[in-house]
Amino acid sequence: MRVLFVASEASPFIKTGGLGDVAGALPKALAQKNADVRVVIPKYKEISWEVRDKLRFVKWFNVKVGWREQFCGVWECFHNGVTYYVLDNEAYFKRDEVYGFYDDAERFAFFDRAVLDMLRQIDWQPDLIHCNDWQTGMLPVLLKFEYKRNDMFYWKMKCVYSIHNIAFQGVFDPQILPELFGFDMELYNNTCLKFDDGVSYMKGGLCYSDVITTVSNTYAYEIQTPEYGQRLDGVLRERSYALRGITNGIDYDEFNPKTDKFIKKNYSINSIEDKAINKTELQKELGLTVDKNIPMLAMVTRLTSQKGMDLLVNISDKLLQENVQLVILGTGDKHYEEHFKWLDSRYGNKVSANIKFDNGLANKIYAACDMFLMPSLFEPCGLGQLIALRYGSIPIVRETGGLKDTITAYNEYTGEGNGFSFRNYNSDELYNIIEYALWIYKDKGKWENLIENAMNSDNSWNRSAQIYLDLYRELTGQD
């Protein structure tokens, strides 16, 4: 099975969000199942030094972007059992940020075409191309309407398109079709790419891929409704026969409390008592009251309304009247940043607001906290709750998307469950479930049972990778 995994980012090369984690971990897990999987990403200015020195120049060629020919260099390296191709064009990708430029339409039009041209240049024929999010949405369109029509080399290639977050759709002026792709306006006029008065790259991927996947079963259902579908729900209902939900995993080598180099004391399910050492150490580091018995609640997240920040803001004063500690790590909307800074100054040794992104501190928080808050408005899959489970920190989540699929509400009578959940997007429900969790926390026997349930949850990529591999085989007709 030969698979080309196409993404705009992949850990450890470059990562801005969950897509980077998936593109780093899923191919690795597929390779461990003997798939010939290769990954292709752009060569950004900020590619990690960890892998930059491994890159080897392969060749260069020109890529047609509208009426122009643009340089494309191919670099290659082998990492974690996977071959990575990194496509180089300094005019498009040697910039201080990854996304958010006026010419993003052109940048990823170049990338999508360059990926297909590269396959011919290196003479490698994948059975299947797996595209991800809007940045690669035009690749299935190019494959169907140009490359398969003009070159038998591409004839048998199938396309899978994965939605990681449907809120980002890549909508641009329709004139890009003739100017960047050389298409006439038929694809716009027949509405397959049309979104309002623009062209949506994501809609192209949805309409012209062979199979659509998304990152959890519940999210696959949700995005077919007007509430969550971001006005693409109609397309998804039409193609529901081709839509699959496959829950993401996490890399158990990267997130492992037994080997984590960032935390004070490594521990496992057989030494849960050592988790408290990480808690007191973090309390010292952040200037909180040092007491292993005070319940510590934490969030490692973007500070945006999608992540349920307004719910926490509404109850924060009331919550902090309790004997609890609150630790926040992340950046986002200014008014949320300012609110948590204010809480930090007002409540001193009960609150630590860390308005930054720090991987090392994130791991310390996962290892130290007792409860991990994810009251999201919507959450395609969510990685935070999976990491928290791995570290024995109990998630408190809203029942949406992947949170609903991965967190089973604790039942104090049967001892089953790995977290706490609430249904409606409501501050009172969040407060009430936190109060219930704090009540269970007082019973050390029940709490230790809950920690064991959490750490025994299987959220590795091994399980999800097998589901993807079965899907690939079904699609390509291979055993």
Curated annotation (Swiss-Prot):
One Pfam family of this chain: Glyco_transf_5
Enzyme Commission designation: 2.4.1.21
UniProt GO MF annotations: alpha-1,4-glucan glucosyltransferase (ADP-glucose donor) activity; alpha-1,4-glucan glucosyltransferase (UDP-glucose donor) activity
CDD domains: GT5_Glycogen_synthase_DULL1-like (cd03791)
Family stated for the protein in its record: Belongs to the glycosyltransferase 1 family. Bacterial/plant glycogen synthase subfamily.
Regions crossing the membrane: none
Function field: Synthesizes alpha-1,4-glucan chains using ADP-glucose.
The keyword Zinc is assigned to this record: no
InterPro entries per the UniProt record, alphabetical: Glyco_trans_1 (IPR001296), GS/SS (IPR011835), Starch_synth_cat_dom (IPR013534)
Keywords tagged on the record: Glycogen biosynthesis, Glycosyltransferase, Transferase
Full protein name: Glycogen synthase
Pathway given in the UniProt record: Glycan biosynthesis; glycogen biosynthesis
Binding site for ADP-alpha-D-glucose: K15
HAMAP family linked to this entry: Glycogen_synth
Domain of life: Bacteria
Record's catalysed reaction(s): [(1->4)-alpha-D-glucosyl](n) + ADP-alpha-D-glucose = [(1->4)-alpha-D-glucosyl](n+1) + ADP + H(+)
Gene Ontology biological process terms from the UniProt entry: glycogen biosynthetic process
